[in-house]
C-alpha cells in the first residue's frame, strides 16, 4: 500500500469498515472526542463498540486513549458488550488531541478525525464533518506515531503535567 491522503467518507469506508475488522493482533486508537458511532455490518447498523468487542473475542488487544468522558449513549452501548469492561484497555488523558488508528503496528491512519460518526465519515453526506488524514504502511511514519501513542499510554509526560487533577487514569500515581 502506498502512503496516501484520505478524506471524509473515505475514512469510514477504508479504515472503519474495511481495515479495522481485519485487525489480527492489536489495535491502538487515540482521539480527543469519542461518541457512540454506528457502522454497517452485514447490512445493518451496529455500534462500533460491537466491532471492538468482536475483535477482542478473536484475541485482538485494543488500547484506547481519549481526552474526555464519552456521553451517555456511548456508555449505554459500552455496557452492552461485557468483553469491553474486562479487556478493552483505556486511558483518559485530558491533554490528548492527536487522532490516530494503528493496526497491528503495520498500518496507520492519522489526521483530523475524532472517533465519532461525524468525524470518521459514518454519518450521511450532509451530516458528517470535513476531515482528512494519511493512511500509511510506511515504518518511518508508523514508528514515531506508535512511540507518541505509547509514551502517553505509559505516562511519560505525567510527572510534569499541569493537569493531573483532571486525569483519572494517570498511570503513575
Predicted regions and their residues:
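Primarily the HKD phosphodiesterase
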Residues: 19-84
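Short His-Asn-centered micro-motif
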Residues: 7-9, 29-31, 65-68, 91-94, ...
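An N-terminal domain-start capping segment
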Residues: 1-21
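Signature of lipid phosphatidyltransferase scaffolds
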Residues: 107-173
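Short, flexible loop segments at the rims of nucleotide/cofactor-binding pockets, characterized by
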Residues: 3-8, 39-42, 85-88
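Short, electropositive alpha-helical surface patch
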Residues: 77-87, 163-172
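Short solvent-exposed loop/turn micro-motifs enriched in small/polar/acidic residues
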Residues: 13, 91-95, 127
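Short beta-strand scaffold segments in enzyme catalytic cores
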Residues: 99-102, 134
